[in-house]
Amino acid sequence: MSPEITPGHIGLSVTNLDRSLAFYQDVLELEVLQRFDDAGRRFAFLGAGGRLFLTLWQQSDAGYEPRHAGLHHLAFQVPTLEDVQTAEAKLRARGQMPRYDGVVPHREGAESAALFFTDPDGIRLEIYSPTGAAGLRAPVAGAPSCGFF
C-alpha cells in the first residue's frame, strides 16, 4: 500500500435526500456536484471547489444510532474561527442548537476551535478551525470535546 493513501470520500445513508441536501448546502456550504433521481435510486455527490468528498444515499428508513458500532462523527476543517462561527449562525437560523451551546476548544488549552452538531438524520458532525480557541473553555475535562457529544 502506498504511504500516500488519503481519504477519498465519505458516503452517508440518509432518510430524505432533499432534506439532507438542503442541510449540507446551507450549513456547510457544500455544492452539489451531481444528483441522481431515477428508477427509485436517489443519491447525490457533494464537495467544494469541484472536489468530491461527501456522497448522500437515500437508503435508510430510520435515523442514525450513535450507540451502534460504526461512524462516531464526521469532521470538516475550515481555515478560520470565523468560518466555524458562520456555520454556527446558519445552524441556529435553522432552529437547531449545537452541542455544548456553541464553539469550544477541542480540549482545555487547545488552539483548535470546533462546533459539534447533528445532521437531520442525527449523524454527528464537527466543523473546526485549527486555530482561534485561545481563551475558550473546554466543556469536557480530561477528554477531547469531540469524543463525547
Which role does the model predict for each range below?
Residues S2, S13-L54, Q58:
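Core segments of cupin and vicinal oxygen chelate
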Residues G40, G70, E111:
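Exposed loop/turn and edge beta-strand positions of beta-sandwich/beta-sheet ligand-binding modules
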Residues V14-D18, A75-R124, F149:
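Vicinal oxygen chelate
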Residues M1-D18, L71-L74, T131-F149:
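N-terminal beta-strand motif that seeds the catalytic metal site of vicinal oxygen chelate
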Residues Q59-Y64:
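Short beta-strand/turn micro-motifs at beta-sheet edges
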